[in-house]
């Protein structure tokens, strides 16, 4: 894998860059219910509906290593001790104790994390969702509204509420990845995506998919990233499954009630319900892996991994600083009066309007 932590930044780049770490994701988006938070360049930015303070994270000690949004709370693994910090509704009661965490999942009313001791959960336990069963070398944990799942050396185990079958794991062949929605669960195994639990709107009926790289489940829909891009299924009341925008190399996906967000080469993109702020990614969000001061959010930086370049006027793959013909009109910049406009190259009077459009080429007023 050339991107072990799945943050969209190649391992080779992270190994040589300042303040980037190949051992954990430097960039991550996490959505739940009606809000999302983004881990970016060591800080957490949140947006959406702030019912219980869930989009108002406290100041987190660096480095922030992991981020997960729950029903009305959010959590992160932060500081050098790798402890879990939560905020929002009943945050302290939903914060697993201990240090050394490297994986985290916030559910509806509980939170689970993985450290060297295994899986630890905290929060509401009305269905046994925080009573962790015996697990062997767990590598991933996921949390729904009232149930939890883990992937360990023996496969997938789920516990907690099971009224829709969300904790009854079917037969799986070499499972590699898990994800949990409000009351349904999915895994990626050798056959593709396998789902179980509540199947309203066919959210637990995945299409045939291959080469699955990432999986995300929401309350009413599900999505997966494959080599061909993002595929979604389930409820489409707000076009969250059918109107997938154009995405440049999506690497991570996260879902809420009626929203979907993806981390791409051009930053975070969200879609679905647009009647409030839940899909409105803040313009202030900074994603700047090459630390050149130009964000890649929205594709502003055409060269997010090259601090010496930010702009490519003619889209030829060569940055303007190195390109001898920025606008690609066949006239070198040294001889082009309008090096950033391919429509003309002569501007006799230097007024910024090329002679082809200028009604007074020499600027003499006539």
Predicted segments, located by residue:
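Extracellular calcium-associated, cysteine-rich motifs in secreted modular proteins
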Residues: 1-25, 284-366
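An edge-strand/N-cap motif at the start of beta-rich repeat modules
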Residues: 3, 7-51, 57, 65-66, ...
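Conserved consensus positions within extracellular tandem repeat modules
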Residues: 3-5, 32, 42, 51, ...
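Glycine-centered loop/turn positions within well-structured domains
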Residues: 6, 34-35, 52-53, 73, ...
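Conserved core positions of repeat-based scaffolds
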Residues: 35-38, 46, 73-76, 86, ...
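Short glycine/serine- and acidic-residue-enriched loop/turn motifs that recur at repeat junctions
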Residues: 48-60, 87-98, 123-134, 160-171, ...
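Repeated scaffold domains used in trafficking and secretory/extracellular systems
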Residues: 64-68, 101-105, 138-140, 175-177, ...
């Amino acid at each position: 894998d050339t991107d072990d932590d799945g943050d969209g930044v190649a391992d080779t780049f992270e190994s040589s860059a300042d303040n980037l770490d190949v051992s954990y994701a430097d960039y991550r988006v996490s959505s739940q219910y009606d809000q999302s938070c983004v881990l970016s360049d060591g800080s957490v930015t949140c947006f959406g509906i702030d019912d219980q303070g869930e989009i108002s994270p406290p100041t987190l000690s660096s480095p922030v290593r992991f981020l997960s949004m729950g029903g009305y709370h959010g959590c992160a693994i932060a500081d050098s001790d790798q402890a879990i910090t939560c905020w929002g509704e009943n945050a302290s009661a939903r914060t697993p104790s201990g240090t050394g965490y490297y994986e985290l999942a916030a559910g509806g009313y509980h939170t689970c994390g993985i450290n060297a001791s295994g899986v630890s959960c905290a929060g509401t336990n009305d269905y046994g969702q925080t009573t962790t069963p015996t697990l062997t070398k767990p590598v991933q944990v996921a949390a729904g509204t009232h149930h939890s799942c883990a992937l360990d050396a023996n496969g997938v185990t789920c516990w907690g509420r099971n009224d829709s079958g969300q904790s009854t794991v079917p037969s799986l062949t070499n499972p590699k990845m898990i994800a949990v929605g409000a009351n349904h669960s999915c895994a990626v195994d050798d056959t593709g995506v396998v789902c179980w639990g509540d199947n309203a709107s066919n959210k637990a009926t995945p299409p045939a998919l291959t080469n699955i790289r990432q999986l995300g489940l929401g309350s009413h829909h599900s999505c997966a990233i494959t080599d061909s891009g993002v595929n979604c299924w389930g409820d489409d009341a707000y076009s969250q499954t059918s109107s997938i925008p154009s995405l440049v190399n999506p690497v991570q996906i996260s879902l809420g009630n009626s929203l979907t967000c993806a981390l791409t080469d051009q930053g975070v993109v969200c879609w679905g319900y647009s009647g409030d702020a839940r899909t409105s990614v803040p313009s202030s969000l900074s994603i700047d892996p090459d630390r050149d001061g130009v964000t890649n959010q929205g594709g502003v930086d055409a060269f997010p991994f090259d601090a010496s370049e930010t702009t490519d006027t003619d889209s030829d793959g060569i940055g303007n600083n190195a390109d001898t013909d920025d606008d690609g009109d066949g006239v070198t910049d040294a001889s082009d009066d309008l090096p950033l406009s391919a429509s003309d190259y002569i501007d006799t009077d230097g007024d910024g309007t090329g002679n082809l459009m200028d009604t007074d080429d020499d600027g003499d007023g006539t």
